[in-house]
From Swiss-Prot:
Stated name of the protein: Ribosome maturation factor RimP
Role, per record: Required for maturation of 30S ribosomal subunits.
UniProt xrefs under Pfam families: DUF150_C, RimP_N
Organism: Haemophilus influenzae (strain PittEE)
GO cellular component term, pick one: cytosol
Length: 151
């Protein structure tokens, strides 16, 4: 069964692309009786406030018609930022050689949180270098991941 995020991704992908942006990912977070739906958009040259406003208007219109969310919700549209979340294996591939942070659904070696250099991706496995040791993690076990911004 598809998750709400997957359903929204499929429903909104084309509309966001028609506005010249990439739908980087979607997060849905329940806060009490309300839900926050976060859309992350990206494009070459960076995302502007106008891009976010245009996507927000278009997406709001689609959600009003399709009504896929049963509860009241707030819609947020933004760029992924420097510490961008990673949602798909192709997104992980873009950041090979960089530091990422990963939060797992099921602990590996009694740890849910890992941070290290993304070394490689093979099929559905990612390899991090953590304290000079390779740590192989199953993509399907990753709950959240993001690029670690370096300043």
């Amino acid at each position: 069964m598809a998750t709400l995020e997957q359903n929204l991704q499929e429903m909104l992908q084309d509309a966001v692309e028609d506005l010249g942006c990439e739908l980087w990912g979607i997060e849905c977070q329940r806060m009490g009786r309300f839900m926050t739906v976060r859309l992350f958009i990206d494009k070459d040259g960076g995302v502007t406030v106008d891009d976010c406003a245009d996507v927000s208007r278009q997406v709001s219109a689609i959600l009003d018609v399709e009504d896929p969310i049963a509860d009241k919700y707030n819609l947020e549209v933004s760029s992924p930022g420097l510490d961008r979340p990673l949602f798909t294996l192709p997104q992980f591939e873009r950041y090979i050689g960089q530091d990422i942070a990963v939060h797992l659904r099921i602990p590996v070696m009694e740890r849910r949180k890992w941070q290290g250099k993304l070394e490689r991706i093979e099929k559905d496995m990612i390899t991090l270098i953590v304290d000079d040791q390779e740590q192989i993690l199953v993509f399907g076990n990753i709950q959240k991941a993001n690029v670690v911004a370096k300043f």
